[in-house]
């Protein structure tokens, strides 16, 4: 059964401006340690900005599916986005968020980017 659905669309240039203006403070707020490690390995600036924008969108979509938004005990750090060898994105959610449910849940994530925008779609469902 679907518990929640979330989507987010972000302008990549807006994320790039935040990175330029706030630097590591912004990166540390948005990316987990594992994501930050992957981001630091990207040498192309456009790809690096897209990487951050997609993760930002994914986490915003996740909190919309959760129904909480960022704040009130939920932060960007509670969500990690990685990829399977096939390229499929995977959303890993902190146990403190999962513990809110008395039943097992699954998170499904779809990401896309096209020129100026990054978009994420998240479905939260009971198993």
Swiss-Prot record:
The reaction(s) catalysed by this protein are: apo-[ACP] + CoA = holo-[ACP] + adenosine 3',5'-bisphosphate + H(+)
One molecular function GO term is: holo-[acyl-carrier-protein] synthase activity
User: Which residue spans traverse the membrane?
Assistant: none
Q: Where in the cell is it found?
A: Cytoplasm
Broad class of enzyme this protein falls into: transferase
Q: Which cofactor does it need?
A: Mg(2+)
The UniProt entry's sequence similarity note says: Belongs to the P-Pant transferase superfamily. AcpS family.
Which InterPro entries does the entry mention? 4-PPantetheinyl_Trfase_dom, 4-PPantetheinyl_Trfase_dom_sf, ACPS, Ppantetheine-prot_Trfase_dom
The EC designation for this entry is 2.7.8.7
Q: Which organism is it from?
A: Marinomonas sp. (strain MWYL1)
Note the Gene3D superfamilies from the entry: 4'-phosphopantetheinyl transferase domain
Instruction: Write one Pfam family the protein is assigned to.
Output: ACPS
List keywords of the entry alphabetically: Cytoplasm, Fatty acid biosynthesis, Fatty acid metabolism, Lipid biosynthesis, Lipid metabolism, Magnesium, Metal-binding, Transferase
User: What is known about what this protein does?
Assistant: Transfers the 4'-phosphopantetheine moiety from coenzyme A to a Ser of acyl-carrier-protein.
Protein name, per record: Holo-[acyl-carrier-protein] synthase
> Superkingdom, according to UniProt?
Bacteria
| GO biological process, alphabetically ordered | fatty acid biosynthetic process
């Amino acid at each position: 059964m679907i518990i929640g659905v979330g989507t987010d669309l972000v302008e990549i240039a807006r994320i790039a401006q935040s990175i330029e203006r706030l630097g590591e403070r912004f990166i540390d707020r948005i990316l987990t340690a594992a994501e930050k490690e992957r981001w630091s390995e990207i040498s192309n600036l456009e790809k690096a900005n897209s990487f951050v924008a997609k993760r930002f969108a994914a986490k915003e979509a996740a909190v919309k599916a959760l129904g909480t938004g960022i704040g009130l005990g939920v932060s960007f750090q509670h969500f990690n986005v990685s990829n399977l060898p096939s390229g499929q994105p995977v959303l890993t959610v902190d146990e403190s968020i999962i513990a809110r449910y008395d039943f097992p849940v699954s998170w499904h994530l779809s990401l896309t980017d096209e020129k100026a925008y990054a978009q994420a779609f998240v479905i939260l469902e009971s198993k």
